[in-house]
């Protein structure tokens, strides 16, 4: 019984195992079938995607190829059009060149034709001139001289009549105006009175110092006179040296230089050059200070630095014995008072009055030259002064026509300041003008660097540029200057012309 039961259990177990195995196989077959199906579907999908990608790529390549073909065709068309335009331009240029060549040929032909006609006209003109000369008995130059002399004579006669009449009228008017205004104006101002002299003396500690100033073979005094341009007079005057110079700036330079050399005791050419340089800087500082001082005293603002320096130079200048800076300041005060009484702008009038003689502060203009008004006006204009001020400066000697009432007031104020008793002296001014004229004649020649009129105008010392003037040219230059002095000046006795040509080489030992 147990055996049967055990056998039944075993048989059931075997049967269950077999059923399980069979079912597993069936499941495995289904799985394999599904895998094959999935694999086939995947391969189909991959193949479809590959075909789609290839198709898209071919389509894109085809589109790009078509676009490139279109671009190439367009570029070819542009190149063809450009070539056509270039050919057209070349044809146009060729036509223009051909036309210009034809026009040039016509111009050349016309020029030749005109030259031939001009030649014929000149020949006829020369023939007519010869006939006129034969008929009149005068050459062409003689006839021209006669006509010019006649016109010149008539012009001078008419001009002299007008000048005499104008001078008489101006004199009567100036006297009347000066007398009427002088009473009310001059009593309201106070001015300083100063006299200018052309000589100065320097005190010496002893007479032995004179020999040191002269130096060995006169080299020290020659160096002084050459560098300064003043005449150093050493005579029998005890313990004193006299400085003679028409230019007050040089006179002051010489005086201060000698005083400093005497105090220091070292007197030789190198020391003289050093002291002259230092004193020149001091005088330049004084010029700047005096210019600023007069501007401050008159309460004038906005003047250019060049104008201030020009005013400072007037501190050392004189006109007919009257200090030019004091005269300008006095004129400015008078002009301001007159402007207020006449209801004009006192600031503009005062400014123009102060600057009316600014041209005399320029080195190239002599103290009383008529050209100082125009030169001063040009300087003022370059410094930015107003047209009213510029015209007033230029017109204060009637070299140009006054264009405003302010310019007339400047003339009146200038005349009042100059015409008051004791303001000016004639002799000093003539002396200064004569010496200045000597220097101006020398400066008119090329190559002249410095020029000094010394010995009261009996000698002119001229320092020339050794790079421009050699020894042979120095002789010719001295002769030409002497001839020009003879032709343009009147003087007693004779004037010595000295040309100084110096070559200086400097090297330093280190």
From Swiss-Prot:
Pfam families: HD, KH_1, RNase_Y_N. One of its GO terms (molecular function) is RNA endonuclease activity. Residues 198-258 form the KH domain. SUPFAM superfamilies: Eukaryotic type KH-domain (KH-domain type I) (SSF54791), HD-domain/PDEase-like (SSF109604). InterPro entries: HD/PDEase_dom, HD_domain, HDIG_dom, KH_dom, KH_dom_type_1, KH_dom_type_1_sf, Ribonuclease_Y, RNase_Y_N. Keywords: Cell membrane, Endonuclease, Hydrolase, Membrane, Nuclease, RNA-binding, Transmembrane, Transmembrane helix. GO terms for cellular component: plasma membrane. Residues 324-419 form the HD domain. One of its GO terms (biological process) is mRNA catabolic process. It is found in: Cell membrane. The chain crosses the membrane at residues 2-22. Its EC number is 3.1.-.-. PROSITE patterns: HD, KH_TYPE_1. PANTHER family: RIBONUCLEASE Y. This is Ribonuclease Y.
């Amino acid at each position: 019984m147990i055996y049967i039961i055990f056998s039944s259990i075993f048989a059931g177990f075997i049967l269950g195992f077999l059923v399980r195995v069979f079912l597993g196989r069936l499941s495995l077959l289904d799985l394999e079938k599904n895998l094959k199906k999935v694999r086939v579907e995947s391969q189909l999908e991959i193949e479809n995607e590959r075909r789609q990608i290839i198709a898209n790529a071919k389509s894109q390549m085809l589109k790009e190829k078509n676009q490139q073909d279109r671009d190439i065709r367009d570029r070819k068309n542009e190149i063809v059009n450009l070539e056509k335009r270039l050919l057209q331009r070349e044809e146009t240029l060729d036509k223009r060149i051909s036309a210009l060549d034809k026009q040039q040929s016509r111009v050349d032909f016309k020029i030749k034709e005109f030259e031939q006609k001009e030649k014929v006209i000149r020949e006829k003109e020369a023939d007519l001139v010869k006939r006129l000369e034969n008929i009149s008995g005068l050459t062409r130059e003689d006839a021209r001289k006669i006509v010019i002399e006649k016109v010149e004579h008539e012009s001078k006669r008419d001009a002299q009549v007008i000048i005499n009449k104008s001078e008489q009228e101006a004199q009567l008017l100036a006297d009347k105006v000066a007398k009427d205004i002088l009473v009310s104006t001059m009593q309201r101002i106070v001015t300083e009175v100063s006299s200018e002299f052309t000589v100065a003396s320097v005190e010496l500690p002893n007479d032995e110092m004179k020999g040191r100033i002269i130096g060995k073979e006169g080299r020290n005094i020659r160096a002084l006179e050459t560098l300064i341009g003043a005449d150093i007079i050493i005579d029998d005057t005890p313990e004193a040296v006299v400085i003679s110079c028409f230019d007050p700036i040089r006179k002051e330079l010489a005086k201060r230089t000698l005083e400093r050399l005497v105090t220091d005791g070292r007197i030789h050419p190198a020391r003289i050059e050093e002291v002259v340089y230092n004193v020149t800087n001091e005088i330049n500082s004084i010029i700047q200070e005096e210019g600023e001082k007069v501007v401050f005293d008159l309460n004038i603002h906005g003047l250019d630095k060049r104008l201030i320096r020009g005013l400072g130079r007037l501190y050392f200048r004189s006109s007919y014995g009257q200090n030019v800076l004091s005269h300008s300041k006095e004129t400015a005060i008078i002009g301001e008072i007159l402007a207020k009484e006449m209801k004009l702008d006192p600031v503009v009038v005062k400014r123009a009055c102060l600057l009316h003689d600014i041209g005399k502060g320029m080195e190239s203009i002599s103290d009383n030259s008529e050209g100082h008004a125009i030169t001063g006006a040009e300087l003022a204009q370059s410094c930015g002064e107003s047209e009213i001020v510029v015209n007033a400066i230029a017109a204060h000697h009637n070299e140009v026509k006054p264009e405003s009432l302010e310019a007339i007031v400047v003339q009146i104020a200038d005349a009042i300041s100059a015409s008051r008793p004791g303001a000016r002296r004639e002799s000093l001014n003539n002396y200064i003008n004569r010496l200045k004229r000597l220097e101006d004649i020398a400066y008119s020649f090329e190559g002249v660097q410095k020029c000094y009129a010394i010995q009261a105008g009996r000698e002119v010392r001229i320092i020339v540029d050794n790079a421009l003037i050699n020894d042979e040219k120095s002789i010719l230059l001295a002769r030409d200057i002497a001839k020009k002095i003879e032709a343009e000046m009147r003087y007693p006795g004779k004037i010595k012309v000295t040309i100084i040509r110096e070559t200086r080489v400097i090297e330093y030992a280190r």
